[in-house]
Amino acid sequence: MRERLVVIDDQISPALVQELCGKKIETWRIEDGACVPDRSPIHTRSHGTVCAALAGEFLPELELVGISTGGNGGAQVENVCAALEWCFQDGAAVVCMSMGVTCGLDLARMGTAARALRQAGCWVFCASSNGGKLTFPAAYPWTVGVKFDPTAREVQQVDPRWGCDVAVGLFQSQVLDKLAEEEPFFHARTNSLAVAMAASQVLQAGGVDHLPVKSQKLWVPDGNKAFQSWEKPVVRLLHSRGKWEALLEEFSRQSYWPVLLSDQVETDWSKMAARVRCLEEAAALLPQLAETAILFLEVPEGNPTVWDYQLDLSQMEAKEACRKVLGFFGEEE
């Protein structure tokens, strides 16, 4: 493991990073799916430049490396995956990235790369969506998902069912103070700007589990009402044990993003599943699941008006169950 901190972001200007935080940065970029030295870096105060400067400020003891992945769109996901794979080959100790995707389909390569990095001993810190949606790779169990929360005290661990692992409270930054002299926006704090701060505190504490816990109740007062206003299909499952993973895989294969909320599973967003004990807990997670295609629900009690369809998995295999659900909602395989 090399004592290197890699920042993965859109565009990174080495000259401006050094100007902001006083550290030199080695810069690379993704070109045609490969990570190559950045011979002609841009000179702009981009999102990536700011995040890299913050990494240099909060983790000054590590050698600083930046990978520019380019613009947005579908190719961006592949570029992020290529950058993560390069970090694994490089033997990086820490990765910080303030970017991600809010759709859980076609992410096998990203998940594999994130898991490999963690198994190699690398810490991967990722920003959650500022809009509160479930975000990858931040939600994966192999990364440390970060959000800014002004009610948090410094850096605290949070319930991973929220799709992240730590909440960062208000914090001071010389880099942001310098930027705020010209752009008042930088007086504010966002999930992206909090990543490096979170990384420094988690590493100093020796891991997320050593941080104080922030209490954030997973509960809404009226679960029935919340579900009745939910616009996506809801299917109640019965007897899902041992079968739900195959069911979700089948829907993913059909290009529908499925999520399971159940009292029969442990939370693992890499499998698109979270443990909830009741309808009120499930309802609390609905806002972050806004981009899912279909929600499977398995809780002990509930009003039948909450779900659109009920499925007993003891009676059928995954392919038949998928066919029945799609047929009910008027979709064709």
Predicted features by range, described:
Residues 250-326:
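ATP-dependent carboxylate-amine ligase catalytic core
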Residues 37-102:
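Subtilisin-like peptidase catalytic core
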Residues 227-263:
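Walker A (P-loop) phosphate-binding motif
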Residues 9, 14, 18, 135-203:
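Extracellular S/T/G-rich loop segment that most often corresponds to the catalytic His/Ser-adjacent loop
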Residues 183-192, 196, 200-234:
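Extreme N-terminal, non-catalytic leader segments
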Residues 76-96, 107-120, 132-145, 152-166:
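Mature extracellular/periplasmic domains of secretome proteins
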Residues 1-54, 58, 62, 181:
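Active-site core segment of subtilase-fold serine proteases
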Residues 65, 123-125:
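Structural detector of well-ordered beta-strand residues that form the stable sheet scaffold
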